Curated annotation (Swiss-Prot):
It comes from Azorhizobium caulinodans (strain ATCC 43989 / DSM 5975 / JCM 20966 / LMG 6465 / NBRC 14845 / NCIMB 13405 / ORS 571). Its EC number is 3.6.4.-. Residues 261-350 are annotated as: Head domain (RuvB-H). This is Holliday junction branch migration complex subunit RuvB. Mg(2+) binds at T72. DNA binds at R297, R316, R321. Residues 188-258 are annotated as: Small ATPAse domain (RuvB-S). It is found in: Cytoplasm. Pfam families: AAA_lid_4, RuvB_C, RuvB_N.
Amino acid sequence: MVAQGGMAPRLMTADSRPEDDADATLRPQRLADFVGQAQARANLEVFIQAARARGEALDHVLFVGPPGLGKTTLAQIMAREMGVGFRSTSGPVIAKAGDLAAILTNLEERDVLFIDEIHRLAPQVEEILYPAMEDYELDLVIGEGPAARSVKISLPKFTLVGATTRSGLLTTPLRDRFGIPVRLVFYTLEELEYIVTRGARLLGIGIVPEGAREIARRARGTPRIAGRLLRRVRDFAQFAGAEAIDRAIADRALMALDVDAMGLDTMDRRYLTVIAQHYGGGPVGVETLAAALSEPRDAIEEIVEPYLVQQGFVQRTPRGRMLTSGAFRHLGLAEPQRPPSALPLFDEGD
């Protein structure tokens, strides 16, 4: 998760917010109830059942993928399916080695420890984690100077589940200690439609298929956003005295929330409009864009751009960001004629 600095809270960001935990009943409780991620789900079922049959702790698992796709939920389900305890923390919270040692020494046999944003662990904390993952022991130095001594503390055999949105920031030694890497992908429209329909039932509001599809197609392939949009559309439906959410109510509610038919919000359109009108569609450097939008560079790169790149509205090139023809069509603007030297030679990559 990015520290958003001056960026105002956005309905369409997939980063977790307290309100997302308010309706815990929307989260699936078992692997069989989890929708989407078919390959990951099938593989996890094999690993869980095999570990249970042997009476062993599950091997360490690393979830990689954009925010909001179910990494935390899957970790909780794994603990529930294994019949063991679940502890949760995040990389930035573990400030020093002693913090991690306190967590690890309080685990029971085969417990699941979930560390979100594991790529943000401090180096000195990460070094403590290596022997804990590999040998199930802590190697601590007690005291200072000539009186310092090394103490080994045995740990119960536990399962570490790490989650990261930026696997490239993980060190190789840490990445190599995860026996089960799992990459999560964006959800299909049909999967999100099912999730929205199920969520509406659990929230006690009726919904017709067209209404569920309208919410699903604006949810950016992300269940967390779908659930957030559903709760807001429910408010509009109840305010209007409607017994069920149909397409018209969903469309009216989402347009009132500045979420357009492609799932773009005000910030997305502002980003595209600045490039189109101020820089002729690009190329323009990300630092220049950050200054023009008065937003931090990391917020632009990690929060605003990924969905726009995924939808084919923006290209990241060696010369900077460029809008595609689809972006101009979506904005209803004429595409300028670019000289050949302005065209991208290849994608810059993430």
